[in-house]
Amino acid sequence: ALAPFGINACTLTGESAPDERRQVFAGLRDGSVDIVLTTPEFLVCHAPEFAATDRIGFVVVDEAHHIGLSRAGHRPAYAQLGSTIAQMGNPVVLALTATSDEAVTSDIDRVLPVAGHVVDDTMRTNLHVVDQRNLRNRGDYLATLVAQGEKSVIYVSSREQSVALARNLRKRVPQMAPLIGFYNAGLSRAERTRVEELFRTGAIAVLVATSAFGEGVDIPDIRNVVLFQLPYNEIEFNQMSGRAGRDGKDARVHLLFGRSDVKHNDRILQDMTPDHDVLAEVYRTLRTWQRKTPGEFFEMADGELARIVSGAGCEITAASAACGIAVFRELGLIETHVAYASGEGARMVRVKEGAGRVELTDSVRYREGLGERDIFKAFYEWVIDCDCARLEQRVSGPITPQMKPLHLR
């Protein structure tokens, strides 16, 4: 889109081939590449290469509220952007988000070199809440809604649920089956792009998705957003609801979640920050594997670690294993790095010998995970009992800090 204006924009992500990466970095150095679209994870990992080009003068951080949500392992690269940007010579930074309360804004200010704030409190009066919280037969309600054929996004709280609900709807509403798809972070980037394009063009009319769908996606004619299950916090609630009616025409946000969802979300949060006994078993397993290769790094993916620990009688998920790796690394109990072969990365682990006694609560990652549970508790207590008028007001407006805006001339 920018080529007619003489601007060369390229994309770099973890899925970019080595040759493509070399070409883009070479283009940055010689001036033939003007803009690089990338992810925080790629930027943090490749900060030295970006810095070496000596041409980075402007950095845009979209969906900057993730800086405030980077606790408990939620895209932690966002929290590292400040030091990464400093490595590149402190270029001008523009941070953008529609969901930034005072706490999140403070986090953004702390991490990024932000000099001022521009706040837009515009209300989206075309959005209307359909309150069906705690509905006993929400599956029937959803099937009836899908049968109407309007472009709709249905949000659920896990990847597995996105696949299961899409299959269920295809069976219950067979006339719509070819038009029902699913979207989650487990799909490859190419698959996600393909599904998004099918939904944009109308080849898919109903999309069952996790929160992975939405941010950065501007599809104007979504008439229905369905919160089938309970979101995890207020920012996620607003981000999901805000996908509806971006063309300015009337759109509806259907609230189908209820108290029965609380236990499901609690379990997922528990998996992401498991208790002491689970993490102790994960650490014992790592030490056992280390004894097979004394002093050397060994390959250990989250899923494989979860399988081994579960096989020993302590059932855990890959999310719990990932938490253990992150916490142990922070506490200085292990070292990790990624080894690449044929373009594929593998996580390598080495358990440090002679590490002293540590407490889990010495880990910021662990404490933040516990904090996520508190945030969820406060959110569900509010959203379950809040009256519909207040919920519609929340859906219609952005989450902004209560501060004096910077007036530009």
What kind of region is each of these model predictions?
Residues 84-87, 92, 99-147:
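Interdomain hinge/linker at the junction between the two RecA-like core domains of SF2 helicases
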Residues 43-44, 66-75, 102-103, 216, ...:
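Catalytic P-loop NTPase motifs of RecA-like helicase/translocase cores
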Residues 1-38, 117-118, 179-183:
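Conserved nucleic-acid-binding Ia/Ib motif block in the N-terminal RecA-like helicase ATPase lobe
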Residues 47-92:
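SF2 helicase catalytic motif II
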